[in-house]
A protein has these predicted regions:
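Nucleic-acid nuclease catalytic cores
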Residues: 185-195, 202-234, 256
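Short aromatic-glycine-enriched beta-strand elements
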Residues: 26-32
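Domain-level recognition of nuclease-like catalytic cores that cleave nucleotide substrates
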Residues: 221-275
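Short nucleic-acid-contacting surface segments enriched for D/E, G, S/T with interspersed K/R
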Residues: 74-87
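Beta-strand/loop nucleic-acid-binding surfaces
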Residues: 63-77
């Protein structure tokens, strides 16, 4: 695989509050215990509901309980465990049309080597990759200076994350995947079967066959990972089509990230193991 140029990029979050994960009643909402000092009273449930949730959390002296928006619809079962420390972006002073005042954007995972900070914001990978392309800090194989960077562009039966053109008129499509699953220093994707992901890779193969450039970029939303692998145990079909895509000319790359409560920063490329 051809290499990217070295890059340092990042995005920032505003007004972060730390809490403890309790439960996830559905894909979009979590129950989190946070410091009452950082919360607006109108966001809390009734006293009875609060006591019931506090019993569920196992806390004798629990803080306030809030329902928060989860910015990742993946399973994340190995991350979202009761008692885990989570980071919330606070929107209480900029609600707009929001129904929930907080968004869960990150979590701390206990590993054999200590605490691993993981960004869970599924919108963040696209943003940092697009920013890198716009600034010229990422230079893609076979492409010159980019003159068009268009998000959410349709090609065939799929809508890719980014469509690009360079000054010579060369065209290409980029699909970005955020990665939050880690086991013993290896990042895996996906964490759940993804027929949509398989379809996107098939379309990237067609892009190559039609003479355009195609890139699949995995943004591993954590640091201290050694490599990235397709999760064949969870979805063998995704791994098979990914290996086929690499053989047919789709450029496949993965980057680890420096993660803090307030930021996500792409820091270095890591190997993609397709064996």
């Amino acid at each position: 695989m051809s290499a990217f140029f070295s890059i340092i990029l990042g995005m920032k979050y505003e007004k972060i509050i730390v809490g403890k994960f309790i439960d996830r009643p559905n894909r979009f909402v979590a129950e989190v215990e946070i410091d009452a000092a950082g919360a607006e009273p109108h966001m809390w449930e009734t006293e009875h509901q609060r006591k019931m949730i506090n019993r569920k959390s196992g806390s004798e002296k629990a803080g306030q309980i809030a329902f928060v928006h989860v910015k990742n619809t993946g399973r994340c079962r190995e991350l979202l465990v009761p008692g885990a420390t989570v980071w919330l972006e606070d929107f209480t002073d900029r609600m707009g049309t929001r129904k929930l005042a907080y968004s869960l954007i990150g979590i701390e995972k206990q590993t054999e080597n200590g605490i691993l900070k993981i960004n869970m914001d599924s919108q963040a990978p696209n943003k940092v990759v697009r920013e890198a392309l716009e600034s010229g800090k990422i230079k893609l194989e076979g492409m010159g200076k980019l003159t068009v960077i268009q998000p959410e562009k349709t090609c065939g039966n799929s809508r890719f994350d980014l469509y690009i053109e360079d000054e010579e008129g060369r065209k290409g499509y980029i699909e970005v995947k955020g990665v939050t699953l880690e086991e013993r220093g290896t990042a895996y994707f996906p964490d759940a079967p993804t027929e949509r992901g398989v379809k996107h890779i098939r379309e990237l193969i067609e892009v190559c066959r039609n003479g355009m450039g195609a890139w699949l970029i995995f943004v591993v939303q954590m640091r201290n990972v050694l490599k990235m692998k397709p999760n064949d145990v969870t979805h063998r079909a995704f791994g098979d089509i990914l290996r086929r895509a690499a053989e047919e000319g789709v450029h496949v790359h993965a980057f680890s990230c420096k993660v803090t409560e307030e930021s996500l920063e792409i820091c270095e490329e890591i190997p993609v193991d397709l064996t």
